[in-house]
C-alpha cells in the first residue's frame, strides 16, 4: 500500500457489511472509485473510472477470508476482465454487489491521507 493514513483515522469498529472500503475525496483518475446509493451504501465500484469523488485508499475489507477467496475465484474464472492488463480488487466489490452483498465506506478527511505512490509524493510527504 502506497498510502499513509494518520493515526486514529481508521478504526475497526467502523467495519460492517460484507465489504468495507476506506475512502477519501481527491482529484485525478488513478484511483478506484466508489458511488453510493441514496442510503449511503455502496452502489458501484470502478477501477480507474471516475464515477464519484470517493477514491479508495487501497485498503479493503471483506467479511471473511473465504468470501474474498470465493469472489476472486468466481470473478476471475467467469469474467477475467483486466484493467490495463492487471487484476484489481475493485471489480470484486462490483461482483459482490451483483450477488446482493452489502458494502459500506468510511470518508476520511483528505488532509489525513498522504499518498506516497511516486517519488514526488514521497518527497512532499517527507518535507511536511
Enumerate the language-model features and the residues they cover.
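Conserved beta-loop-beta/alpha segment of the NTase-like Rossmann-fold superfamily
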Residues: 1-33, 38
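Catalytic-core segments of class I nucleotidyltransferases/pyrophosphorylases
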Residues: 42-114, 120-123, 127-128
Amino acid at each position: 500500500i502506497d498510502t499513509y493514513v494518520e493515526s486514529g483515522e481508521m478504526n475497526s469498529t467502523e467495519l460492517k457489511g460484507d465489504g468495507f472500503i476506506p475512502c477519501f475525496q481527491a482529484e485525478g483518475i488513478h484511483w478506484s472509485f466508489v458511488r453510493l446509493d441514496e442510503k449511503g451504501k455502496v452502489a458501484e465500484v470502478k477501477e480507474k473510472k471516475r464515477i464519484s469523488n470517493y477514491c479508495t485508499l487501497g485498503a479493503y475489507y471483506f467479511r471473511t477470508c473465504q468470501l474474498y477467496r470465493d469472489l476472486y475465484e468466481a470473478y476471475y474464472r467467469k469474467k477475467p476482465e483486466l484493467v490495463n492488463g492487471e487484476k484489481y480488487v475493485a471489480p470484486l466489490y462490483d461482483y459482490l454487489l451483483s450477488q446482493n452483498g452489502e458494502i459500506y465506506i468510511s470518508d476520511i478527511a483528505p488532509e489525513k491521507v498522504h499518498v506516497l505512490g511516486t517519488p514526488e509524493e514521497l518527497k512532499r510527504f517527507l518535507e511536511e
